[in-house]
Amino acid sequence: MARRKLRVRQHTPVREVECPATAHDGDEVRFRTHLATGGVVESRNLVAAVGGYAKPRVPALASDVDPVVAQLHSRDYRNPESLPDGAVLVVGAGISGQQIADELAERGRRVFLSVGRHRTYPRHYRGRTIHEWMYVFSLYDDFVTPDPRHLGEDRRRLPGLPVTAVKDGAGELNLGTLAEKGVTLVGSTRAARGHVLELADNVEEIARDAARSLREVLDTIDTGLRRRGFVAPEQHPAPTVRTDHITDFGPTLDLARHHIGTIIWCTGFGPDYAILPGRALDEHGVPIQQKGILGSIPGLYYAGLPDGNSLAPAAISANVENGRFIARQIHIDHIMRSGSSASLMV
């Protein structure tokens, strides 16, 4: 950004984007962006790079947990020393959940990890990062599309990020390595009754599914390399998730009995489009758009907008083409309005 001399305002949240219904396509100013600091930025075009991971998600059952137990979202977690004494329950086995559970265990805390369905990918494989392989072999699109019959909340649900957790940027981190460190794996949290949580008895099943997802992505990469004649160093041993020492926990977890004083909700984030003009959103509060890029209002573009069946919007590396498309559209708008003879082909 410094090289291109972009005017960047750091630590400046946007309070609201205003686009009056009377705004005309020919207006020089179509958007007024109100900043939390009190300033206003006027523009003809607007790129809303709000993404889909803006607002912490905490399940409703959290309100049914005994109030003596401290609760926080992973966004607010800082370090083990900042937590009350006692054992800790981490809910959610995504990247944050596994890394937090690992750090707590390393610091000598008794840790329980309530698992959920996820895919486990290695951070690196055969000389490349997993994100490079996902880009080369189009793995960003290999995710399930929400059932279109269930709108509303399902439309806001993002495709799950594969777990590529590592410890200190080096060793792989997964359910197998956590269990080996003494982290107690418990089933998915389903309900709460005071100090007792109701669980799905599914630890072994989820661990097997995670191990299978790892084998499948490695096989996809290996097969793709062979078919396309690409050269990449072999990796031995290949990454794996050990499940032989993982067992089901049972249908309930008594927080008091296990001296659990803190629950950390590593249950992800959801989108928050409240700053955008109301007429840019549908009845569910979701942007009206085309292909996750073109907004319903002329001059409004989106970057990183979740499209429901792909991880591409969640990865900066996969948004390069979207960024180029948006830049071309704004360039064309500028050239055609200025009467310049500059080329439109950029």
Predicted segments, located by residue:
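Flavin (primarily FAD) cofactor-binding/catalytic cores of flavoenzymes
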Residues: 1-346
